[in-house]
């Protein structure tokens, strides 16, 4: 049985790893060779033109800096805020926990809509073209709050909290000295969800950012592809078409 499971996991690993290796191989393949012979896991002719084009200028470096900063700040803030909300919901002695739980759950069923969301972000919070726009609108997720609440309720006995209160610990003392250290597994899980979400986010910069210095990595790469599409489609005239001939469109 173990042998069968090992073989199954090896096959699944190959299935998941192969597209990554193929993408990496394509990035090192010469553009003309790719057009003539198609995709291959081993390049017939190696080339770094795609990397040279992507790294030309400081745009990609700045996009990495913005993405890393937004991902780290957003993850730390969102996990802390959601933990502050989730912890009271797990307490038996918090009489309003049912109402606050329903309030969090209700937002998963109905959305306020795109237009009200945009008005709040731009007219009330003034987030447009600011660094905060890359993570503040996504700081709190109701689903993550419910996960944290369930984790705390299921892993930390309420008797421990009562013992700490009897010993004279304050609510913030219990939260920082007991709840956070004992919830590391749940925090790590939600933190990973948030980190991946911020790193791969394309929606927020598309809606709120027009300043190229604030483009994150995903939106910057998309802007590169759109520029290449525009050049190769001839939208900018014959001079631009001439300069677009050598653009490594497929390998970038």
Can you say where each PLM-predicted feature lies in the sequence?
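A hydrophobic, multi-pass inner-membrane permease signature
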Residues: 1-252
